Amino acid sequence: MFRIESARIIAGVTRIVRDVGIAEEIAQDALVTALEQWPQSGVPDRPGAWLMATAKHRAIDLVRRKETYARKLAEVGRTLEDEPPPAEPAEPDDIDDDLLRLVFTVCHPVLATEARIALTLRLIGGLTTQEIARAFLASESTIAQRIVRAKRTLAKAAVPFEVPYGADRGARLSSVLEVIYLVFNEGYSATSGDDLVRPALCEDALRLARVLAALMPEEGEVHGLAALLEFQASRIATRTGPDGEPVLLADQNRARWNRLLIARGARAMSRAGSGPYALQAAIAGCHAAAVRYEDTDWAAIATLYGRLVQLTPSPVVELNRAVAVSMAEGPAAALPLVDALAREPALSAYYLLPSVRGDLLERLGRPREARGEFERAASLTRNERERTLLLRRAARL
């Protein structure tokens, strides 16, 4: 329950104290108070409202101690000191507004990407430092220091606790969406370690995307991201075999794809715009719509990737487009596209480039060259499951 409520409590308290680090401490203090009192007094009818009221009382006490009572009380305009907890819950719109402000604050561009991810999972996702460290194969002390430094950076930069509007809004929203997207991707296809998939990270990112879509119903790209994650999450259970080995898309048991998540993805897609996340969601939707691998509309997918390249030029997107072209028009049509990408500095250490090239060469009947590409790809990946699969493909040739 606290994981669900913690983000809202931290958001509500941050509006008072204007410091996410202090707000988190107060929220945790409210939880400790609940653990001490509830066994004797019983769980209140609205535990979330009780926690919120208790935390806000603590926040106001802190403000009163730090600043002149009259000036600070007038500034924050609070009257909660007259209301003993448990109190009536705050208006849902007020809570949602505070939560949205917190999302934009912890994803502020003043923070490095790794710091934004860690702070978002901690304050919005409600994960413990230990859980975040385990998910990203980092030490607990490293993650703890990253979170502490991020809080200090926000305080030092005096990042306003507000939802941006005007010209700054688009860039700030992109920063928020990027954090959620990166968290999901790390769970969907782990960059390192012994596991290909980390479902818990995908679940956390999907939950954040759903929350954001509910908070910003007018933003098409938010729904585009939500749709993308719903579609992708529908396949997670089939991406690995019984022993954790990777299962290629062509070999996945589509009867095990989660139809509820696919339906949710389709609903979110109906509210998406035409931005990069919406286009990626449309591509994922094409895969989800195919009952069999052979039914996949690769021509449509190649077209969508072409549009995505125009919106967000990227060699990785170009590589994905080349794969779709190879399926729609044959490997001979795609090989020149992949060869052209070999000159891209950004892909020089990207294991999927030689992996895709190896697949094309194998399909073209050039096994010796294909084997060399698979071996090179295996040397570049940091994921043990991917490395094993690539070496197995090389050994077959």
Identify the residue ranges that each predicted region occupies.
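Σ70-family region 2.3-2.4 aromatic/basic alpha-helix that recognizes the −10 promoter
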Residues: 31-35, 45-74, 151
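Short, charged helix-capping/linker segments at alpha-helix termini
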Residues: 10-27, 37-46, 140-141, 191-195
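Residue-level preference for hydrophobic side chains embedded in well-ordered alpha helices
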Residues: 1, 5, 9, 30, ...
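"A position-specific structural signal for the A-helix of alpha-solenoid helical repeats
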Residues: 225, 229-232, 280, 284, ...
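A short, charge-rich alpha-helical start-of-domain segment used by transcription regulators
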Residues: 1-11, 21-24, 170-178, 182
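Amphipathic helix-loop-helix modules that constitute alpha-helical solenoid scaffolds
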Residues: 66, 74-131, 138-306
